[in-house]
Swiss-Prot record:
Protein known as: Solute carrier family 25 member 47-B
Pfam short name (any one): Mito_carr
Organism for this UniProt entry: Danio rerio
Superkingdom assignment: Eukaryota
GO cellular component: mitochondrial inner membrane; mitochondrion
Length: 288
């Protein structure tokens, strides 16, 4: 078992959250709320009404849990890939089959949903909870006062299954997204690296950034549905389930709604995943 990949994925994931969280908040608000006309208007309105802290709502929960989920993604990916490689009796020096990379990435993405779902719903609900900066105090009338209270409130009001609301969409987002993510990263590194050599740092940074953008291009439609299901019920219920959320959203807002936040996702994805893979490769090379 490749334990180094679990640790490296954990470090890389936590670092990536810290880099990309402000843009993630903007993305979630664009996907779930109708009061914003576009990216820059959302940024200006958030900054004006809530201050810089408005971009970091709910960050403590994902920064602590993404390290676990990212560890699962990278660790599962590497070990499944190695298993498939050995299953076909391929030698250690042979390049991995593209189908194996895709399948291993898909498995890694789906595996981390059990850990990711509760933290993600807390993150999304806190990000969507807007409050003027001058009113932020212990006497705040906000429904959720912080990550832990939000987690407990959801479990109390909606049951433990409420913490997994939108998890089907999350799995359908992360499976194909991580499959594309790892396949793109490996393909770029393979093209730009001399055979039997480790990719240089410029290649790692480029491949990491591009793979993140490609992964989000694939995952954004399910990301929109996931976010809408997660905030549904906070102030009235609109959707009866996963399929109804898709059909209702497309019917009332057009098919373009499924790509709402795509630009923000791609802008955020490049520096975030450049950082993730840089930290991942650094830790793996240190431990091996």
């Amino acid at each position: 078992m490749h334990l180094a990949d679990f640790l490296a994925g954990s470090v890389g994931g936590a670092f990536g959250v810290a880099v990309g969280y402000p843009l993630d908040t903007v993305k979630v608000r664009l996907q779930t709320q109708t009061g914003y006309s576009g990216f820059w208007q959302c940024v200006r309105k958030t900054c004006r009404n809530e201050g810089l802290q408005g971009f970091y709502r709910g960050m403590s929960m994902p920064i602590s849990t993404v390290s676990i989920s990212s560890s699962l993604v990278f660790g599962t990916y590497r070990n499944i890939l190695q298993f498939l490689h050995q299953l076909q009796h391929r030698s250690a020096g042979e390049p991995h089959h593209k189908a194996h990379i895709f399948l291993a990435g898909f498995t890694g993405g789906v595996t981390q949903v059990l850990v990711m779902a509760p933290a993600d719903i807390v993150k999304v609900r806190l990000q969507c909870q807007t409050e003027p900066v001058q009113h932020i105090s212990q006497e705040s009338s906000s429904k959720y006062r912080g990550p832990v209270q939000c987690l407990l409130r959801i479990a109390r009001d909606e049951g433990l299954l409420g913490l997994y609301k939108g998890s089907a969409a999350l799995a359908l987002r992360d499976g194909p997204s991580f499959a594309t993510y790892f396949l793109t990263y490996n393909t770029i590194c393979e093209i730009l690296t001399t055979e039997n050599q480790r990719p240089g740092w410029p290649v790692v940074l480029l491949a990491g950034g591009v793979s993140g953008m490609c992964g989000w291009a694939v995952g954004t439609p399910m990301d929109v549905i996931k976010s809408r299901l997660q905030v549904d019920g906070v102030s009235g219920r609109r959707y009866r389930g996963f399929l109804h959320c898709i059909t209702h959203s497309v019917r009332t807002e057009g098919s373009g709604v499924l790509f709402r936040g795509l630009t923000v996702n791609c802008i955020r994805a490049f520096p975030v995943n450049m950082s993730v893979f840089a930290m991942y490769e650094a830790v793996v090379r240190l431990l091996r």
